[in-house]
């Protein structure tokens, strides 16, 4: 007889995020990505598809989305925005499937983290190319590159602070990453990559200042 699969439990599969004040009102991960991701999980739950396979699929779709943003045609930019939304949904579904089936592993969590960071770098870099293609403004595009460098520094500081705290979590919350990705999707659909450039410049700088302030106020010798 075929092995009976327990029904999919959505509440058990959803990861509890870190509720920053802004996420109470702009939690696109909770209200958009997770419900759509749950549909994906329900479809693949009875199959042999693994969480890691969904992680790879999310990454590949994200890479294609970034490539679309680099093309100087409006239709491809819109397609890139739609593909990025799909990548976000799949990125929500992989962890949900792992928790639902009890297949969570250190390798899977690390794989997801590594591919997320690579995907973020490609996505943010492609938006700079998209802005330059749309406007020809090299000055703000160069400023966007500075913002991208600041983003990488922001991520490095995040992991250093979390390592110092000996925190068990391995990456930024899904809600935070989803909000940043959603801003890219909205700006791409609206054709406002200029706003996105300013966000890429100002947000990492503000986050770096916050991380340094936060680290300064941590206990000198955490348990």
Label the model's feature ranges.
Residues 2-41, 113-223:
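A feature for the membrane-embedded catalytic helix bundles of lipid/isoprenoid biosynthetic enzymes
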Residues 22-24, 44, 48-54:
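Active-site flanking loop/helix segments enriched in acidic
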Residues 38-46, 95, 99-102, 109, ...:
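Short amphipathic alpha-helical coupling elements at transmembrane boundaries
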Residues 43, 84-87, 105, 109, ...:
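A generic hydrophobic-helix recognition signal that picks specific residues
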Residues 48, 68-72, 190, 217:
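Helix-loop junctions at the membrane-solvent interface of multi-pass transporters
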Residues 51-107:
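Membrane-embedded alpha-helical segments that form the functional core of polytopic membrane enzymes
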Residues 60, 82, 86, 111-115, ...:
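Hydrophobic residues within alpha-helical transmembrane segments
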Residues 81, 106-110, 167-171:
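The feature identifies polytopic integral membrane transport proteins across all domains of life
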């Amino acid at each position: 007889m075929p092995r009976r699969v327990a029904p999919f439990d959505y509440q058990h599969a959803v990861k509890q995020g870190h509720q920053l004040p802004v996420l109470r009102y702009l939690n696109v991960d909770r209200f958009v990505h997770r419900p759509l991701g749950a549909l994906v999980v329900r479809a693949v739950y009875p199959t042999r598809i693994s969480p890691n396979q969904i992680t790879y699929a999310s990454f590949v779709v994200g890479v294609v989305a970034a490539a679309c943003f680099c093309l100087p045609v409006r239709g491809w930019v819109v397609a890139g925005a739609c593909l990025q939304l799909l990548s976000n949904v799949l990125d929500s579904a992989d962890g949900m499937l792992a928790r639902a089936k009890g297949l969570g592993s250190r390798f899977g969590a690390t794989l997801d983290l590594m591919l997320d960071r690579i995907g973020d770098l490609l996505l943010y870099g492609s938006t700079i190319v998209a802005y330059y293609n749309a406007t020809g403004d090299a000055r703000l595009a160069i400023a966007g590159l500075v913002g991208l460098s600041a983003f990488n520094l922001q991520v490095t500081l995040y992991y250093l602070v979390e390592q110092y705290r000996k925190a068990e979590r391995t990456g930024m919350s899904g809600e935070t990453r989803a909000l940043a990705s959603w801003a890219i999707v909205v700006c791409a659909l609206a054709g406002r990559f200029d706003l996105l450039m300013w966000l890429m410049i100002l947000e990492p700088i503000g986050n770096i200042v916050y991380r340094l302030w936060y680290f300064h106020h941590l206990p000198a010798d955490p348990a």
